[in-house]
Amino acid sequence: MFIADDVYGAIDNVAWYRQCYLRKEFEKCIEYSDKLYAVSEEMCELYEQRFNKPVEVLYKGCDLSTEPKGFLNEPIKIVYAGNLYYGRDDTLAELAKALEKINSTKTVAKLEIYTGATITSEIERKLNIVGSSEIMGSRPYNEIKEIMKNADIVLHVESFEEKQKELVKYSFSTKIIDCLQSGNVVLGIGPSNIASIEYLKKIDGAFVIDDMDNIFDSISKILNEKNYIKRKCKKGLVNFAKENHELTVVREKLKEDLTTMCKGKSNESVAN
């Protein structure tokens, strides 16, 4: 069984007359599962405490067969590809405003936002800033992979609002793996104690801004270190991705786990 979101905790938000039924059904799934996986270490800890069963983290794998590009665009291209839910549009808006200020005398960097989300007039006003930020609409996944590969900095964001933080606290966005697959520097913007942001802090090839008040100073510093961006990407991020997320590694681990479970079941049958 794979736990991608805190479904059990979310039952509290369901109508009261369905809560008992849903909890019992979920508890049955946990009880009958021979192996439990979760999307993040934080989710593993949470469900181990709830159900007193071991839970292992299982991350999405990525294809690292192509070499990262060895140059920076002019201006620096920052790419966000994903949804705008859970207040992520507000975080992107703060980044866009910081870039507008940085670009006041010369265009240093531009943010491109690829999303299939419905664009309201308010979102358009916040995120379409001439010369600094642009909503590019949706694209097929294969095209998104190429766009991210040709970027300089790929972006993952979370909201700083308390309500939104609680909703994504234990979740791990698979978009982070797409960012790693691009071979470019990853920039995470979001509060501490969120699973996805804490994970990015572990990666030597990633930048993290976890204080919205420092976004202008932090992004300015990052953009001023162009040579460092290239070195950081090649040495830190790519090595981390190969060790932890390369598709063959993830598949081999899953294969070993399934083989072990099958052997265990076979031995039980013989014993009976």
Per-segment meaning from a language model:
Residues 71-92, 96-99:
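Conserved donor-binding/catalytic core segment of Leloir-type glycosyltransferases
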Residues 7, 17-36:
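Membrane-proximal helix-turn-helix segments that form the acceptor-binding/catalytic region
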Residues 1-16:
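A short, histidine- and acid-enriched strand-loop-helix "catalytic/donor-clamping" loop
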Residues 210-217, 227-259:
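A charged, aromatic-enriched C-terminal amphipathic alpha-helix characteristic of glycosyltransferases
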Residues 106, 115, 120-150:
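Nucleotide-activated donor-binding/catalytic signature segment of Leloir-type glycosyltransferases, i.e.
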Residues 87-90, 142-146, 154-177, 186-198:
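Nucleotide-sugar-dependent
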Residues 42, 60-61:
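Carbohydrate-associated surface elements
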